[in-house]
């Protein structure tokens, strides 16, 4: 599967930011002190710039039953304010797409690996038939920022952002977007792209350290839950 170009993050302008390359182009490789940054995920809290992930919005009354029928996940009964993960499989059972899901206020949101949203949208469009669904790529509108570490909930609260109370809970954010808890000490924030720098500044002021994406962790150093589990970037 080929990947489309990704949007460069405005957080690359932060002091000490070293741009990534290859599949991680568009976000920082680190912010000047990789080992200290990685330790924040174990001892405190860090925010991870994952704004190169693709985001697709799927409104329409048939969205959940439709997604249930064309992906690997049981989505037909997904409740409002909850999330999960899903796959698109080839006819031979090979994984072609992985995405993380949030169901909120009449729209199902799918975020996926950097550069792969156009391919996922093309697949969804090819399977629409006459159903009442309107998938669209909103990567240019929403950006993903993940807060992780044992102090993640405290940092989110101090920053004036929601800390979802349970695993896979999804909570709206004032000003747009939502927060989704994916692990015990890990929350994804999907925020308006124009607000990304401001949200990162609020998290930093509340005590979170900017940290590199999991693929940049040094061997033998602390790693985030995503890199340990092999979950997506």
Language-model region placement:
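Basic, glycine/lysine-rich polyanion-binding surfaces/domains
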Residues: 1-233
């Amino acid at each position: 599967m080929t990947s489309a170009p990704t949007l460069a993050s405005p957080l690359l302008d932060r002091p000490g930011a070293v741009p990534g390359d290859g599949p991680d182009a568009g976000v920082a490789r680190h912010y000047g002190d990789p080992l200290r940054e990685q330790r924040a995920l174990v001892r405190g809290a860090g925010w991870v710039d994952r704004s190169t992930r693709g985001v697709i919005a799927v409104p329409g009354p048939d969205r959940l039953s439709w997604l249930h029928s064309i992906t690997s996940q049981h989505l037909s009964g997904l409740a409002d304010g909850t999330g999960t993960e899903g796959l698109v499989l080839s006819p031979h059972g090979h994984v072609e797409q992985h995405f993380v899901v949030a169901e909120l206020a009449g729209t199902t949101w799918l975020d996926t690996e950097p550069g792969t949203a156009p391919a996922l949208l093309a697949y969804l469009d090819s399977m629409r038939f006459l159903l009442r669904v309107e998938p669209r790529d909103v990567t240019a509108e929403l950006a993903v920022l993940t807060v992780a570490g044992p102090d993640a909930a405290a940092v989110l609260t101090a920053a004036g952002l929601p800390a979802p109370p349970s695993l896979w809970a999804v909570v709206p954010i004032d000003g747009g977007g939502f927060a989704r808890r994916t692990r015990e000490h890990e929350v994804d924030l999907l925020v308006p792209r124009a607000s990304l720098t401001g949200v990162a500044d609020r998290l930093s002021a509340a005590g979170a350290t900017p940290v590199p994406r999991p693929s940049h962790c040094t061997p033998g150093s602390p790693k985030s839950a995503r890199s340990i589990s092999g979950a997506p970037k």
